[in-house]
């Protein structure tokens, strides 16, 4: 609770949300979706960040009676109308700006039978490109493609007051106690706004090639200036 941006000290079993690990200046170091189940907190971080988040949390244990370990779980994401899940499935709802989403956490050695059970219940398999299209529509960032080392939480609208849904806490709790980076969050929220924000850019298809992640966005006209950069395409 004292390390991440989400309020977790009174989280009940079944609670799901997101959380951020910030540096002292309020810049985002790690993002994770989380689930509380049977006395454990499951943090789902992007694979390139999992080990560094694990290392940080391990260093912060001190005298606390807690064990931190990497699991052998994989995540299956269901989008669209709900279907019946296997009885032993560990799942969490994820509120975002796209289609209804349920993440199912599955032991790696149970992946194939779980997929078969979901298909039997009506799910259809789709690849990463299909998921990425839904993620972009939902304004859900990929930390490596859409954000950078200067990103602060208010740059992602869904992290602060999750898209106007009062039942979903987003990734930042604005009324919890101190945590690293909180001063930046409070200052931006109460006194101003982020100088940058994640936005959806529509491409009209008139150019023969697509832009690449990292390409600059510029204003048109004689005195063009850089106003942003391309993320996920």
Region roles according to the model:
Residues 1-233:
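Basic, glycine/lysine-rich polyanion-binding surfaces/domains
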């Amino acid at each position: 609770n004292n390390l991440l941006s989400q309020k977790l000290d009174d989280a009940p079993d079944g609670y799901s949300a997101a959380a951020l690990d910030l540096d002292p200046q309020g810049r985002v170091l790690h993002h994770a979706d989380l689930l509380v189940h049977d006395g454990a907190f499951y943090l789902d971080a992007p694979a390139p960040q999992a080990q560094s988040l694990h290392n940080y949390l391990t260093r912060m244990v001190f005298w606390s009676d807690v064990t931190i370990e990497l699991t052998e779980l994989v995540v299956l994401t269901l989008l669209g109308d709900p279907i019946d899940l296997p009885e032993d499935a560990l799942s969490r709802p994820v509120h975002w700006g796209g289609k209804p989403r349920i993440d199912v956490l599955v032991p790696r050695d149970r992946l194939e039978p779980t997929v078969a059970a979901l298909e039997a219940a009506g799910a259809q398999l789709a690849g990463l490109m299909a998921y990425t299209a839904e993620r972009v529509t939902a304004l859900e960032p990929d930390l490596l493609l859409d954000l950078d080392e200067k990103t602060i939480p208010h740059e992602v609208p869904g992290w602060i007051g999750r898209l106007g849904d009062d039942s979903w806490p987003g990734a930042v709790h604005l009324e919890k106690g101190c945590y690293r980076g909180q001063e930046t969050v409070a200052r931006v929220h109460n006194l101003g706004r982020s100088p940058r924000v994640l936005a959806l850019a529509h491409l009209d298809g008139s150019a023969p090639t697509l832009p690449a992640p990292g390409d600059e966005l510029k204003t048109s006209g004689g005195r063009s200036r850089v106003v942003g950069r391309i993320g996920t395409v």
